[in-house]
Structure formats: structure tokens, C-alpha cells
Amino acid sequence: MRLDRMTNKFQLAISDAQSLALGRDHQFIEPLHLMMALLNQDSGSIHPLLTQAGIRVSALRSLLSQELERLPQVEGTGGDVQLSQGLIRLLNLCDKLAQKRKDKYISSELFVLAALEGCDALAQCLKKSGATKELMEQTIEQVRGGQKVDDPNAEDQRQALKKFTVDLTERAEQGKLDPVIGRDDEIRRTIQVLQRRTKNNPVLIGEPGVGKTAIVEGLAQRIVNGEVPEGIKNKRVLSLDMGALIAGAKYRGEFEERLKAVLNELAQEEGQVILFIDELHTMVGAGKGDGAMDAGNMLKPALARGDLHCVGATTLDEYRQYIEKDAALERRFQKVLVDEPSVEDTIAILRGLKERYELHHHVEITDPAIVAAATMSHRYVSDRKLPDKAIDLIDEAASSIRMQMDSKPESLDRLERRAIQLKLEEQALAKENDEASRRRLDHLQEELRDVEAKASELSEIWRTEKAALAGTQHIKADLEQARLDLEVARRAGDLTRMSELQYGRIPELEKQLDLASQAEMQDMTLLRNKVTDLEIAEVLSKATGIPVSKMLEGEREKLLQMEVALHERVIGQNEAVDAVANAIRRSRAGLADPNRPIGSFLFLGPTGVGKTELCKSLARFLFDSESALVRIDMSEFMEKHAVSRLVGAPPGYVGYEEGGYLTEAVRRKPYSVILLDEVEKAHPDVFNILLQVLDDGRLTDGQGRTVDFRNTVIIMTSNLGSDIIQEGFGHLSYSEMKSAVMNVVTHSFRPEFLNRIDESVVFHPLDAENIKHIASIQIASLRKRLAEKDYTLEITDEALSLIAEIGFDPVYGARPLKRALQQEMENPLAQKLLRGDLLPGKPIKVSCVDGELVFEQ
């Protein structure tokens, strides 16, 4: 008996049998040990062989365990085990059987055949489990498929389809695939190509997320339901698992062997299998080493002959990048283009999937939620495709509701945490003896009783509501199972079972569900089990930062009072504030053009009058933070080549991978305020880029991605015509001044650029009263900084007027005021604080004496 003539799996099993005997203190390795090792082998061939022969493997395993328990145990042998005479005889018999079959290597299944020829304990166990010599010989022939064992890895290559593919038709029969709604044209076209004589290989091409894999699942479901032409009736759809095919292929040629085994088995099936290769481009170059042949080239002969019915799926970009380069592979496939479904089709798809998601999350998905998911994802999520992005919204919204149902309600959690906090305080105060502590303890105990009572009441309500929801979940699961059983009975033609389910079980469950739902309909105070359009809007708002959720009363009031909020920081400039506020209100009320930015403005006026300040104020109003302001200083874009920094460098240039300054900022924050400061200083070519943004609300970056600007406010500032504003201030009306300024502007900017801007706003120069108002705002900011150091600041009206008077300059606006404040107030204050003249805790009074500021405490 030569071990080197055994297959790798058989050699491994003998090593495992030795370990088993050693662990149980047996002196000899018996046939029982080897049989147990073969049964326990990972991805071994004996377990599936016996199962295929109809032998009860679990019964055989328990019989083997009983026999192994009876074997004598020998201690103190020092780990010395050897093959028993019975096992040597069986292995020699295996060698004889292999020679008889003209095999070069002895495979594991011959051991079972050899064992059945004997009459020892192993033969008895096999016979009790239902194995006979004739049955095993038949099964071995089926498994081998007429092939000889010419390779030590021959056992690994058997049952290749079972190991390296997933049976989609089997999954469809079990009801594990999601229903496929619509897509009839694409499925029909796929079937049409599959029925060709040669090159009967469709490849589904479309953007990621449009449902290419779903079309193949739909085909599998139609085959199972018999809704296909005679040519492909009763065929199986197998999905190739590329991961399993490549995983563990350590040595050169192992991957090719596995793929060849798959192709050989497919050839034996004689056209009864349709192979589905998802991500088809992975086949090109897969397994390619130095001079090795890749998977794509191995498939070509089978594809061209028509031996292999193959359906591929890949994206447009990857098809161009990998498949089109290999013309010989491309011509063997027939393209089937899969377009993105419309919003109406997406709604139909979501309605079909609704029950599956309800069953998974144990929540109810309302129809308004489905409509909202399709319409909102189409409008606000621009970088992905329907129906995938709409399904994601439904899934995540249902998940959030489910999470709230499973976890403690926030209000109850808050009360319980407060109770713990109060108990800790109570323990600390109980150790104190003074009067104040005792009074505090009494108040605290009263509050604790109140909090515990509320928490107990809420906890009871929560438990009741949770129990009510659990009832409907069980009924829904039973109803889904009954419907699956009905489908199985219909396919099997079992009319008795069909009538029992259709007219008995299903109507009864539907009635129970209706009653349970009515009980649930009563107003729930803590739990929600319905996904509505509000939840969809919340999920979308969190993901994109775009406020699409329903406006609360407070937000409506805030929007109506928007001018007041903006005027807190922007003094004067009523026309500019009104224009911006109206644009934001139009957008939030849903009246703005969905294909353009929320608003685009050109702010014109002299320096220091509040053009940039209004943008900062708007960003703070919308996002509670000035960091949401995307500020681009256009003076940096004075050269022609600098334009590429906005949208990203073109291919072949340094920095191509990094993306553009403007496009990347908007991709990350689709809802933002974009400030293009000092726009007249930029190169004229910059405005060519802005034309597309202002008109269609989109821009293509250097990598060909479309960036959505439809949820941005675009503000450009310029100093053009500031001399006219200065001269005309006081004696020209606003409309006269605006027309004079626009006359200057038209000479600098092209008409097609100006024509696309929503509104050009002219800012007035600031008068003395405005400057005084701004001075009070800046002193409030200084007061806040001093408060951090425990100083309070009080300033008289005369001192404020003096600072405003010093800082007033009609040409330079409010900027000289800042310098005046630094020189007249901040510098002397800093010196006094450092000298220790002013003490913390006491108010600092600033007054005006003889035209100078005086600081005293």
C-alpha cells in the first residue's frame, strides 16, 4: 500500500484518523476511525456522496460513535499508534478497486465501497444506515460522471457547480428572492438572446443600482413559475461565486483547474444550466499570473460554441474599461442596456418590495413613505441611481423605527437617568447635618418621588404598547409563510393543499391581522410602528444635510422673521436682505425651480458695507455655523490656468485625483452658501464655468462626475461702480443709482453671465447712524470676550458716539471702525489688564471725558 498513490483528501483523512485514535487512547487506527475522519472532513466528498445515495449520515455518525466507544483504550503507550490489520486489508482492497477502474490515484469513495465488501463493524454500520454495494457503485458513477481519477486533487474538482455557484432557481423556489416588478422588456430581451443558436450570451449593462442583478433573479423566478418559452423551461440559473473560485487557490494552475471543472460540469449538463456571472469584468484578468491564461480567455471557446449559456452583468464604465478592450470576448456577448427606471416605475417597484421590508423590520410602511422615497431620492440624491437609492431610504427609515421600538424611549430613558442622578445626590446629602443641606435633601426627595412616579407610568405604557406590536409581527410572519406554501403547492399541482391555504389559512390570518391592526390603531404615546414620509425626509436630511423634513412651527416663524435675524449683524441694506430672505423662503416652501440653485445674487457696492458679512450672517442663520460658508476668493483665479483649480485638473495633469476646490466642497455639503468674493478680479474664463452652474444647477468636475448645485445659494460680490455709489449717495434714488452701477457692470461682465443671475443688489454706503449701530455690535463682541476672563464692560452713549465718530469714513465703510475700536479701546484695556489696574469681578466703566475715553472701576 503506497500513500503517495492516494488523493490529497484521502491522505488528509488518514492523518485525521491517526489524531482521532491518539486522542481516544486507542492502540490501532481502525477502519472506524478513518470513516469518522472522512465524514468530518471539511469540503470532503464522502458526506455529499452518502447524502446523494440517500443514506442517513446522522444515523451513521451515531453508530460509528457507539462502535468507537467499545474499542479498548490503552494508556502509557507514549503516543505509539499504528494501522490495524483490518485497515491495511481495506486500503489494499481500495488499491485493487482503483486499478480495476484504471484510476491513477486512490480516491476516498473507494474506501466506502471496499468497506461494504467486508463484514466487520464498519460494514455493519454502513448497512444499518441503508448503504449497499450496488447503490454506492451507482452513486459513484453519477458523481464521477465517467471521469477517471488522474490527479491528486481530483476530489476537490468534483461537485464544482455545488461548491462554486449559487442556485438562483432553488432560492426562487424557497421564496428567498425579492419580487421583481416591471423590467419586462429587459427580461424578454434577455430570454430572446438566450434562445439564439450561437453567441446566446446576454450581458446586462447599466449604471450601478439600476437593478441588473434583479433582472436575472426575475428570470429565475419566471423559470420556476413556468412563465418562459419552451426553449428555457426547467433550466437552472446558477450564479458563479468568483470569491469561492479564487479563495484558497495558492498554487499556479489551481484556479484554472477549478474553473475548468466548472466548465466541464456545465458541458455535461448539456445546456440545462444558465450561468450568471455578476460583475463580469472581474473575469478579465482573474487568475492571470506570469504567462498564465486568465478566466476570460478560458471562457471564450465555450461561449463561441454555444456550449455555455452565460448571462453577464457589469456597469457601463467597467464594460468600456475591461470588456471592450478584448474585442474577441466582447463579440461573444450581446449587449442588453438597462436604463434607470422613472420615478413612477420606482414607486411600483417599492410597492412590490414593501411586504418583504415590513416583514424584516416588523414595521408598517405607508404609501406616502414610498412616494416620498422615490420623489425625494430622485431630486436630492444626484450621485446614485433609482431604484437603489429609494430602496435605501425606505430600508434605513424602517431600521430607525425598528431601533426606536426595540430600545427604551428617549423620554423614559431621560427620567431613569435623572432618578439615578438624584439618588446619588441624596446619598451625598444624607451625610451632611447643616440646615441648608437638610432643606435641599427634602426638596430632592420630593423631586425623586415625582420622577420615579412618572418613570413608572411611562414604563408601564411602553410595555403595553410593545406587547401590542409583537402580536401583529407574528401574524405577518405566518401570513408570509402561508403565501410561500401556496406558491409551492401551485407549482407541485397539489390542489388539496392549495384550496386549504387559499380558502382557509390565508383568509383566517388576514382577518387576524386586520383585528390586530385595528387594536394597534389606537394612539400610541411612546412607540411608532409606521414609516411615513416624515421619517423618509428625516433620513434624507441626515444623509445629505438638505432640510427636506416638514417644517415645524418654530421654523416657519423663524423663516418669516428672517430679515430681523439677518439685520442683527447686517446694518442697513434692506434691499439685499429682502432679496436673500425671499429666495430662501421660496426654496423652503417648495416653490423654487428644482433645476436651478436656490438663489444667485451679485452684490455690488463700496468696500466695508456688509456684502461679505451678509453671506456669513446667512450661513449662520441656515446652518447655525459660519463654517457652512464655502468662501472662494476670486482674486486667486486671476490667471487663465488657475480656473482648473475650481473643477479639478484634467487627466494627465498633476492633482487629477484630488478633485476641484469648488466641486469637492459642494459634493461634501450639497446644501451650502457659496461666496465668490471680489468676482471682478477673476479671469474672464471663470465665468464660462459659472454659466452652467447658474442656469442648470450642475457642474462636471475634472473626473467627469456631475456635481449638483441645486441646493446652494450662490453669492458673488464686486466693488464695480463703487465710485458712482459714493458720489450719488444722498441725492440719487436707489433705482437711479442701480441703473448707473449696472451700466458699469455690463462693460465688465458678459451679458449671458448677468442674464443668468437672479438679482443684482446695490449696497448703500454707510452713514454715521449705521456706524454707531455697528460699533455697539462690535462692543458686544468685545464684552463677550471679556466675560470669559470674568470682566464686565459698561460703556456710556457718549463714549460709543466718540468711537463711531473716530471710525466713520464714508469711503471705506465699517472697516475703519474696527481699527478705531482696537486703538481707542482694546489697546488701553490690554495695558491696564496686564498692569493689574483693573480687577476681575468688578464692572469696567468706559466714559468720554474731554474727547477721550476713560476706563475706571
Curated annotation (Swiss-Prot):
Stated name of the protein: Chaperone protein ClpB
Region (Repeat 2): 83-146
Family, as annotated: Belongs to the ClpA/ClpB family.
CDD domains: AAA, RecA-like_ClpB_Hsp104-like
Superkingdom as given in the UniProt entry: Bacteria
Keyword list, A-Z: ATP-binding, Chaperone, Coiled coil, Cytoplasm, Nucleotide-binding, Repeat, Stress response
Region named NBD2: 555-765
Residues holding ATP 2: G605, P606, T607, G608, V609, G610, K611, T612
Biological-process GO terms, alphabetical: cellular response to heat; protein refolding
Covalent S-S links between cysteines: none
Chain residue ranges for the region called C-terminal: 766-857
Amino-acid positions noted as binding ATP 1 in the UniProt annotation, renumbered to this chain: G206, E207, P208, G209, V210, G211, K212, T213
Compartments it resides in: Cytoplasm
Annotated segments matching region Repeat 1: 6-71
InterPro entries, per database record: AAA+_ATPase, ATPase_AAA_core, Chaperonin_ClpB, Clp_ATPase_C, Clp_N_dom_sf, Clp_R_dom, ClpA/B, ClpA/B_CS1
Keyword Chaperone appears in the UniProt entry: yes
A single GO molecular function term of this UniProt record: ATP binding
Keyword Nucleotide-binding part of the UniProt annotation: yes
Its job: Part of a stress-induced multi-chaperone system, it is involved in the recovery of the cell from heat-induced damage, in cooperation with DnaK, DnaJ and GrpE. Acts before DnaK, in the processing of protein aggregates. Protein binding stimulates the ATPase activity; ATP hydrolysis unfolds the denatured protein aggregates, which probably helps expose new hydrophobic binding sites on the surface of ClpB-bound aggregates, contributing to the solubilization and refolding of denatured protein aggregates by DnaK.
Coiled coil: 391-525
One Gene Ontology term, aspect cellular component: cytoplasm
Subunit structure: Homohexamer. The oligomerization is ATP-dependent.
